[in-house]
From Swiss-Prot:
GO terms for molecular function: magnesium ion binding; O-succinylbenzoate synthase activity. This is o-succinylbenzoate synthase. It catalyses: (1R,6R)-6-hydroxy-2-succinyl-cyclohexa-2,4-diene-1-carboxylate = 2-succinylbenzoate + H2O. Mg(2+) binds at residues 161, 190, 213. The gene is menC. Its EC number is 4.2.1.113. Converts 2-succinyl-6-hydroxy-2,4-cyclohexadiene-1-carboxylate (SHCHC) to 2-succinylbenzoate (OSB). Pathway: Quinol/quinone metabolism; 1,4-dihydroxy-2-naphthoate biosynthesis; 1,4-dihydroxy-2-naphthoate from chorismate: step 4/7; Quinol/quinone metabolism; menaquinone biosynthesis. The active site is at residues 133, 235. It holds the Pfam family MR_MLE_C. It comes from the Bacteria.
Length: 320
């Protein structure tokens, strides 16, 4: 006997969260809970404003139609990435094919303060990895901040994310202020320039390795080994089903590229599932999941160690 619930939710964000020049005041999304006999599976559907093609309102109508079809015994594939991902997680939990083991190590997001980062890294076992957003301020400032962090913490490796913010000139201005002796400790810089060709040129000219992120979701992207490209950053909410995520990870690993499972600012429920996916598909890589503290609450499932209050399922708005 099948049953299902769909919930709508909204979480207040911290004041300083900006996505593509838009301030994100709340994180909005949906949960689906599928039950069959004694088994249960949850999934999160939370399109990311400015990045997802679909809105959560569009996702809601498609999800409700899919759930009603599932209750009637149908299980067609979904095209919208956020729904395909959330539904595939719920189905995987229902079938017990999403392993429980999780990688809760997260590369902490750094605001540029080395003292703050040293405190965050003090309890981090093994490799010291942190992430810095660049491209929000002047490229010269970004270069100075990155250089300061690498100088202050000798065993630090940084992941940088520019979100295609730089022209070739700005990329050169950034690199000019990063000591060439430190550049090998930049694990990768995600999408430094507005075009892939400019990003490739940046890697060649600076010796700083790059990673593809947005490029993975473009129709002409192909997995090929390229000089200067070290990693791919996979955001499942923007990618699609678990099967598609696994295919991308396998394609990256076949080329000896690092594959990083990364957050699209999901709620704690979605983040705990991403931690399980990371442990399953990329067990040797620290995922990019340090986004929970951008929110003012957790929901349904707790992230280990978080002190944020937890909103239980009874407090959510039920749609079905």
């Amino acid at each position: 006997m099948r049953s299902a619930q769909v919930y709508r939710w909204q979480i207040p964000m911290d004041a300083g969260v900006v996505l593509r020049d838009r301030r994100l005041k709340t994180r909005d999304g949906l949960y689906v809970c599928l039950r069959e006999g004694e088994r249960e599976g949850w999934g999160e559907i939370s399109p990311l404003p400015g990045f997802s093609q679909e809105t959560w309102e569009e996702a809601q109508s498609v999800l409700l139609a899919w759930v009603n079809n599932w209750l009637a015994g149908d299980c067609e594939l979904l095209q919208m990435p956020s729904i395909a991902f959330g539904v595939s997680c719920a189905l995987a939990e229902l079938a017990d094919t999403l392993p429980q083991a999780a990688n809760y190590r997260a590369a902490p997001l750094c605001n540029g303060d080395p003292d703050d980062l040293i405190l965050k890294l003090a309890d981090m076992p093994g490799e010291k990895v942190a992430k810095v957003k660049v491209g929000l301020y002047e490229a010269v400032r970004d270069g100075m901040v990155v250089n300061l962090l690498l100088e202050a913490i000798p065993d630090l490796h940084l992941r940088l994310d520019a979100n295609r913010a730089w022209t070739p000139l700005k990329g050169q201005q950034f690199a000019k202020y990063v000591n060439p002796d430190y550049r090998h400790r930049i694990a990768f810089l995600e999408e430094p320039c507005k075009t892939r060709d400019d990003s490739r040129a940046f890697a060649r000219e600076t010796g700083i390795a790059i990673a593809w992120d947005e490029s993975l979701r473009e129709p002409d992207f192909a997995f090929v080994a390229e000089e200067g490209v070290r990693a791919v950053v996979i955001k499942p909410t923007l990618t699609g089903s678990l099967e598609k995520v696994r295919e991308q990870v396998q394609a990256a690993h076949a080329l000896r590229l690092t594959a990083v499972i990364s957050s699209s600012i999901e709620s704690s429920l979605g983040l705990t599932q991403l931690a399980r996916i990371a442990a399953w598909l990329t067990p040797d890589t620290i995922p990019g999941l340090d986004t929970l503290d951008l929110m003012q609450a957790q929901q349904v499932r707790r992230w280990p160690g978080s002190t944020l209050p937890v909103v239980e399922v009874d407090a959510l708005e039920r749609l079905l």
